[in-house]
Amino acid sequence: MARITVEDCLKQIPNRFELALAATYRARQLAQGHTPKIESRDKPTVVALREIASGLVGVEMLKKVPV
């Protein structure tokens, strides 16, 4: 499997801080049992980054975070 890099993800979410927040929130969702949007056997963090790099998850993820 190809490696996922931050540069791949930055094409979808150009702000590094928003990228980190979106990836963290999505990884927590996956760890809690949410269905992944891609087929993968990787850890939740890697799956979250792959979803972001492929454009399936974006900055809109931050609007779902409970305050």
From Swiss-Prot:
Instruction: Describe the reaction catalysed, as an equation.
Output: RNA(n) + a ribonucleoside 5'-triphosphate = RNA(n+1) + diphosphate
Annotated GO molecular function terms are: DNA binding; DNA-directed RNA polymerase activity
Please report a single Pfam family linked to this protein.
RNA_pol_Rpb6
Q: Which domain of life is it from?
A: Bacteria
UniProt keywords (A-Z) are: DNA-directed RNA polymerase, Nucleotidyltransferase, Transcription, Transferase
Magnesium found in the keyword field: no
> Any one Gene Ontology biological process term?
DNA-templated transcription
UniProt enzyme class? transferase
Q: State its Enzyme Commission number(s).
A: 2.7.7.6
Query: What's any one GO cellular component for it?
Result: DNA-directed RNA polymerase complex
Q: Does the keyword Electron transport apply?
A: no
What family is reported? Belongs to the RNA polymerase subunit omega family.
**Annotated HAMAP family:** RNApol_bact_RpoZ (MF_00366)
> Per its database record, what is this protein's job?
Promotes RNA polymerase assembly. Latches the N- and C-terminal regions of the beta' subunit thereby facilitating its interaction with the beta and alpha subunits.
NCBIfam families referenced in this protein's UniProt entry, alphabetically: rpoZ
Subunit structure, briefly? The RNAP catalytic core consists of 2 alpha, 1 beta, 1 beta' and 1 omega subunit. When a sigma factor is associated with the core the holoenzyme is formed, which can initiate transcription.
This chain's protein is named: DNA-directed RNA polymerase subunit omega
Gene that this polypeptide is encoded by: rpoZ
